[in-house]
Amino acid sequence: MEFEHLLELIGDEPVFDSALLLAGDISPEYVRLQLSRWTKAGRIYQLRRGLYAVAPPYQKVKPHPFLAANRLRRASYVSAQSALAFYGLIPDTVNATVSVTAGRPERLQTPLGIFEFRHIKPELLKGYRMTGLRGQQALVALPEKALLDLVYLQPGGGRLEYLRELRLQNLDRLDLDVLRRQSAVFGTPKLRRAVDVITQLTRQEARDYEVL
């Protein structure tokens, strides 16, 4: 298989699975050998076993980190700091793309960046949607769920001090009714207290805006 044939096969896919190359009578050993050669030559990136992305200057589409995160762990969605920064709810640039999963926690360092997968209970895997990302798509937590996931995962995350440290902004983008409903799913006093604090911060931000 020539490299040009690989590019034709994957088309505009930002990330591809090695199984895509196994159609027909082609030998799996041959495919593995070719992928290894292209990786060593810097033509493709190996993200994890069986998962690859074409490297510049050959790539047609640069993979969005959120899409890559979804592909690295199928049963996951982007949440916490990464989703909050995406929605403009925190000003900080996040060094790693953070997702939640019912599987084991994991931190992966790849050519596309660092990806963290935090564990939550299976019954808490809700409150996310398919989100458009400049021609790509990925599962991303709703703004309210992203904040609740972070509070749940962070020791002391429900404290006023911690929530102030996040430098939350644009809180008018949060639906407080949705926040309360989703917090009930967690069923913990910590989340209930956090919602009260977030409501307080939202009202304070609104008052400060009126003064300006």
Tell me what each language-model feature is:
Residues 1-75, 111:
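Short beta-edge/loop segments at beta->alpha junctions of small alpha/beta modules
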Residues 18, 80, 179:
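Generic structural marker for isolated residues within well-ordered, non-membrane alpha-helices
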Residues 21, 38, 83-84, 183:
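Hydrophobic alpha-helix position signal
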Residues 24, 41, 87, 166-169, ...:
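Residues at alpha-helix termini
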Residues 26, 88, 152-156:
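Hydrophobic/aromatic-lined pockets within catalytic cores
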Residues 27-28, 90, 189:
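Short coil/loop linkers at secondary-structure junctions
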Residues 46-55, 65-126:
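Short gly/ser-rich loop at a beta-strand->alpha-helix junction or flexible surface loop bordering the NTP-binding
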Residues 128-212:
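Hydrophobic alpha-helical interaction segments
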